[in-house]
Amino acid sequence: MILLPFHTRRLVSHVYCGLKPASKKKGIALEMARPSSNLADFREAFAKAKHIAVITGAGVSAESGVPTFRGAGGYWRKWQAQHLATPEAFARNPSRVWEFYHYRREVMLTKNPNPAHLAIAECETRLRKQGRKLVVITQNIDELHRKAGSRNLFEIHGSLFKTRCTSCGSVKENYKSPICPALAGKGAPEPDVQDAKIPVEQLPRCDENGCNGLLRPNVVWFGETLDSNLLGEVEKELEICDLCVVVGTSSVVYPAAMFAPQVAARGVPVAEFNMENTPATTSFTFHFQGPCGTTLPPAIARHETELIS
């Protein structure tokens, strides 16, 4: 499946495909569509769940001070992320794109998981001891879930700290700072900063024997296909989960935008934790508005029915 910005109308029409026509009593239909914010009811569903799928987006990392590059202020220099995170942008100007990703890597090396990341990781560990399962499906490329201790983790859009050779295809972890000498001190995000225009031969290169090919970030760019094997594993998890928790995602990037609505269409409870409503909010059972680091931890903390181990 290809990574695309997802148009609101397309999402809503797909979510409601196959449902009965809306009632002519519009007030009643709207009332039925409104998700609950009753924490006790969510906690009851949480206590019963044996297989929980947690889907996370940029909002969960924003509280760690990670730039989201979305919304009105979502610019790096003069560009929005969707204008840099494409194969075409890299082909046209690999120096500029590498500056952008070098900046993001350097920022992330200074950031730590916040209470939401830690609560998810702790919950996974706790439930594992009870014979229950929690998996994390994240759109984020910052590795904060990994840093927090999440093990059942699907990073569907890749990682800032992995590179892929454009020649031999080799994928490797890379935590170097800077990633190459020419990028040292480069990547400042202010709009008046000029491009470094680094010669391509000085950009990150492959260290496989005899290759020396140009490296690129091992992330999924807009217009690229997600790893089919990874996506297949994710789909299996979504097909068997009995509770879905959506944290800090805008629900506008396809295909991840469809994950939770598809779970909801099975009649499985879905809870959204976000700073604001999203195009998918009305298809969910629960919606808890506010900072994820505040709203999520008490929601997935140890339930009174859980055995202490």
UniProtKB/Swiss-Prot annotation:
Cite a single GO MF annotation: protein-malonyllysine demalonylase activity
| Matching InterPro entries | DHS-like_NAD/FAD-binding_dom, NAD-dep_sirtuin_deacylases, Sirtuin, Sirtuin_cat_small_dom_sf, Sirtuin_class_III, Ssirtuin_cat_dom
Once renumbered to this chain, the transit peptide range reads: 1-35
Q: Which cofactor does it need?
A: Zn(2+)
Q: Which Pfam families match?
A: SIR2 (PF02146)
State the PROSITE patterns in the record: SIRTUIN
Q: Where does NAD(+) bind?
A: 57-76, 139-142, 248-250, 274-276, 292
Q: Which domain of life is it from?
A: Eukaryota
Binding site residues for Zn(2+): 165, 168, 206, 211
This chain's function reads: NAD-dependent lysine demalonylase, desuccinylase and deglutarylase that specifically removes malonyl, succinyl and glutaryl groups on target proteins. Has weak NAD-dependent protein deacetylase activity; however this activity may not be physiologically relevant in vivo.
Give the comment on domains: In contrast to class I sirtuins, class III sirtuins have only weak deacetylase activity. Difference in substrate specificity is probably due to a larger hydrophobic pocket with 2 residues (Tyr-101 and Arg-104) that bind to malonylated and succinylated substrates and define the specificity.
The record ties this protein, via HAMAP family, to:
Sirtuin_ClassIII
User: Which family does the UniProt entry place this protein in?
Assistant: Belongs to the sirtuin family. Class III subfamily.
Name of the protein in question: NAD-dependent protein deacylase sirtuin-5, mitochondrial
